[in-house]
From Swiss-Prot:
It is an enzyme of class 4 (lyase). The keyword Lyase applies. Pathway: Amino-acid degradation; L-histidine degradation into L-glutamate; N-formimidoyl-L-glutamate from L-histidine: step 1/3. GO terms for molecular function: histidine ammonia-lyase activity. Belongs to the PAL/histidase family. It comes from Staphylococcus aureus (strain MRSA252). This is Histidine ammonia-lyase. The modification 2,3-didehydroalanine (Ser) is found at residue 143. It catalyses: L-histidine = trans-urocanate + NH4(+). Contains an active site 4-methylidene-imidazol-5-one (MIO), which is formed autocatalytically by cyclization and dehydration of residues Ala-Ser-Gly. One of its GO terms (biological process) is L-histidine catabolic process to glutamate and formate.
């Protein structure tokens, strides 16, 4: 597969396909023409010795300091080196790769004044899978993701660390190995690389992909639990959900009916009891609301993936050109979206933990043994798996605190409101990792409960899932180190998203 970039039409589905295949990036000719035109504007500014922020002046509080024309390129190199203040663990390889794609895509809109050499260097790094090592901490989310993107830029100029073919190396060594020159930044290009929201947006894209997948995975896991508790099928009838008219809720109900079709373990209203608890009866309403959040997040991310979020921005109208200092680098729209994503994923974990509690609690699980123990008393069974799930969902409640309302002033009060969008992105991904483990715990417990109930009664679709996951997690016939089972299932759930990941 080839991913064609034009600065206008990039989607999350394209990104997902790119990550699943050994894809290459190609650039549409019209986009390259826009790059050339915007660069010509920068060259005219230099030739005419105009005063334009970030091209002929310093940055931030130093925006009124005029730079000597002989030092324009040095200014850009200094910018990258001084702003590379990222700290902590690096972003994943997937996030770093998507970050480069997004930065390239925004340059192709033709409002940043980048050279074709910069564009081609980014394309080269992407296609050769030279992955910059980019620390996660250090961004305020306005003026964009300065610190993370500076580490990306360091790799392009041969001064950063990269992962190449599974090894951590100096980018200069990799470029030499591939007979490629480090990029020599020209006027405006350092700013064009780091003024933007690509760190938070790239992490947001990966988080969205994994969150959506968790939403679908949670349905078949819930269907296993539903059958193990002889859940009532009537609550999923189409007419119940059609009268509320939330499409995502309607869709979840339809998928739950599909997962449960043919089961002899489900029951009808008043057959055993009149109503189920909310965590079974309200799966379409709860999960559907999470999908509503995911759809909003996707919309915001795709707007930003195709946005010009540099500063200043270069425009051409008729025969006139002008350069405007604005604030498109401010990450507030993405910060809000990613804070919402945290809520949607946290609720999937919350309701999963409550379902698995019903499977192990002898007061709630019908005729199943306490904690599904093979020998109650001597064997503890799934007792502490529920503890672990409770710990994770409680941690998520702390992580779900909105980062986007926690502004702090910076740059001598010039940058006096920031988005903290990258913090929202980082915390959001930790919530996803936690939620995946909670669902893995529910899966391990639901597999055992279904076995005790009699797998011959499972619906055909959930029976296939049972057989698939029993190859990973054996029956609980005695107490063992269940953390190994939980991590094995969590990893398997994640690998189903990135079956053949392009950056590995």
């Amino acid at each position: 597969m080839t991913l064609y970039l034009d600065g206008e039409t990039l989607t999350i589905e394209y990104i997902k396909s790119f990550l699943q295949q050994q894809s290459k990036i190609e650039i549409i000719d019209d986009a390259l023409e826009r790059v050339k035109k915007s660069r010509a504007v920068v060259e005219r500014i230099i030739e005419n010795e105009e005063t334009v922020y970030g091209i002929t002046t310093g940055f931030g509080l130093f925006s009124d300091v005029r730079i000597d024309p002989t030092q324009y390129n040095e200014l850009q190199m200094n910018l990258i080196r001084s702003h590379a203040c990222g700290l902590g663990e690096p972003f994943s390889k997937e996030v770093a790769l998507v970050m480069m794609i997004l930065r390239l895509n925004t340059l192709l809109k033709g409002h940043s004044g980048a050279t074709l050499e910069l564009v081609r260097q980014l394309q080269f790094f992407i296609n050769e899978r030279i992955i910059p090592i980019i620390p996660q901490q250090g961004s305020l989310g306005a003026s964009g993701d300065l610190a993370p993107l500076s580490h990306l830029a360091l790799a392009l100029i041969g001064e950063g660390k990269v992962l190449y073919r599974g090894e951590e190396k100096d980018s200069d060594d990799v470029l030499r190995e591939l007979n490629r020159q480090p990029l020599n930044l020209q006027a405006k290009e350092g700013l064009a690389l780091i003024n933007g929201t690509q760190a938070m947006t790239a992490q947001g894209v990966i988080s969205y992909i994994e969150a959506e997948d968790l939403g679908y995975q949670s349905e078949w896991i819930a269907a296993l639990t539903h059958q193990s508790l002889n859940g009532i099928i009537d609550a999923y009838r189409h007419d119940v959900h059609a009268v509320r008219n939330f499409q995502e809720q309607i869709n979840v109900a339809a998928r739950m009916r599909d997962w449960l079709e043919g089961s002899t373990l489900t029951t009808r209203q008043a057959e055993i009891r009149v109503q189920d608890a909310y965590t079974l009866r309200c799966i379409p309403q709860i999960h559907g609301a999470s999908f509503q959040v995911f759809n909003y997040v996707k919309q915001q991310l795709e707007f930003e993936m195709n946005a010009a979020n540099d500063n200043p921005l270069i425009f051409e109208e008729a025969n006139a050109t002008f350069v405007i200092s604005g604030g498109n680098f401010h990450g507030q729209p993405i910060a809000f979206a990613l804070d919402h994503l945290k809520l949607g994923v946290s609720e999937l974990a919350n309701v999963s933990e409550r379902r698995l509690e019903r499977l192990v609690n002898p007061q709630l699980n019908g005729d199943l043994p306490a904690f599904l123990s093979p020998e109650p008393g001597l064997q503890s069974g799934a007792m502490i798996m529920q503890y672990a799930a409770a710990s994770l969902v409680s941690e998520n409640k702390t992580l779900a605190h909105p980062a986007s309302v926690d502004s702090i002033t910076s740059s001598a009060n010039q940058e006096d409101h920031v988005s903290m969008g990258t913090t929202a992105a980082r915390h959001g991904y930790q919530i996803i990792e936690n939620a995946r483990r909670v669902l893995a715990i529910e899966c391990v417990i639901a597999l055992q409960a279904a076995e005790l109930k009699g797998v011959e009664g499972l619906s055909p679709k959930t029976r296939r899932k049972y057989d698939e996951f029993r190859s990973i997690v054996p029956s609980i016939t005695y107490d063992r180190q269940f953390h190994k089972d939980i991590e094995a299932v969590a990893q398997y759930l994640k690998q189903s998203i990135y079956q053949t990941t392009a950056c590995h």
